[in-house]
């Protein structure tokens, strides 16, 4: 099997928005195998570390679960230190011959930080508290940025749930690998 470019993940959309003391991650439910939809209600969002961390994945499902397990192990070694746990995971991802072949990306968030862990082992903190990955990620990101800016400029008082659901719905209308069966997890302080 030829290793694909991890920056070109197909088949899902994961979006994270942070505002004040709240962070929310949403993922669509579609699982595709080639051009065929296999499942419409998959859960690509998961809580870790006694529900203090939420994460979503794009890419190969088995690879993502391997990364969830590794991240959970790092969080046990570094409780309450999400950035450090993610950097340690990224180091392993780059150095380990087996892990380097994994084709997945993750968004990880706790009450204080949101991070993207790329398929290349990069750990990135998004600007403006908004991050997206997957085939519909750019559409969801653009929609979320527009909604957040509109909310801020015109004092619309849009909830995070409304903002993220609307952005995901827009992405699902554009990306054929994303559906509108949206699953949301939230952390608020």
From Swiss-Prot:
GO molecular-function terms, A-Z: metal ion binding; threonine-type endopeptidase activity
Location relative to the cell: Cytoplasm
Catalytic reactions on record: ATP-dependent cleavage of peptide bonds with broad specificity
InterPro entries assigned to the protein according to its UniProt record, in alphabetical order: ATP-dep_Prtase_HsIV_su, Ntn_hydrolases_N, Proteasome_sua/b, Proteasome_suB-type
Source domain of life: Bacteria
EC number: 3.4.25.2
Main location: cytoplasm
Location of the active site: 12
SUPFAM superfamilies named among the record's database cross-references: N-terminal nucleophile aminohydrolases (Ntn hydrolases) (SSF56235)
One GO CC annotation: proteasome core complex
Cross-referenced Gene3D superfamilies: Glutamine Phosphoribosylpyrophosphate, subunit 1, domain 1
A Pfam family the protein falls into: Proteasome
Keywords: Allosteric enzyme, Cytoplasm, Hydrolase, Metal-binding, Protease, Sodium, Threonine protease
Activity regulation, per record: Allosterically activated by HslU binding.
Binding site for Na(+): 172, 175, 178
GO biological process: one example: proteolysis involved in protein catabolic process
Cited function: Protease subunit of a proteasome-like degradation complex believed to be a general protein degrading machinery.
PANTHER family: ATP-DEPENDENT PROTEASE SUBUNIT HSLV (PTHR32194:SF7), METALLOPROTEASE TLDD (PTHR32194)
HAMAP family found in the cross-reference section: HslV
Family: Belongs to the peptidase T1B family. HslV subfamily.
Subunit structure, interactors included: A double ring-shaped homohexamer of HslV is capped on each side by a ring-shaped HslU homohexamer. The assembly of the HslU/HslV complex is dependent on binding of ATP.
Record's protein name: ATP-dependent protease subunit HslV
């Amino acid at each position: 099997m030829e290793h694909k470019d991890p920056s070109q993940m197909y088949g899902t959309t994961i979006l994270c928005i942070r505002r004040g003391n709240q962070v929310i991650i949403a993922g669509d439910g579609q699982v595709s195998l080639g051009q065929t939809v296999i499942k419409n209600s998959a859960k690509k969002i998961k809580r870790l570390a006694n529900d203090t961390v939420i994460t979503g994945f794009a890419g190969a499902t088995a690879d993502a679960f391997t990364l969830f397990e590794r991240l959970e192990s790092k969080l046990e070694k570094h409780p309450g230190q999400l950035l450090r746990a993610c950097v340690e995971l990224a180091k392993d991802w780059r150095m380990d011959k087996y892990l380097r072949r994994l084709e997945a990306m993750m968004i990880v968030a706790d009450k204080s930080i949101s991070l993207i862990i790329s398929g290349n082992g990069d750990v990135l903190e998004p600007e403006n508290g908004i991050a997206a990955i997957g085939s519909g990620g750019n559409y969801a990101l653009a929609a979320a940025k527009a909604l957040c800016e509109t909310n801020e400029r015109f004092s619309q008082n849009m909830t995070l749930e409304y903002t993220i659901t609307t952005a995901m719905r827009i992405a699902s209308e554009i990306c054929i690998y994303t559906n509108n069966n949206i699953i949301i997890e939230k952390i608020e302080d």
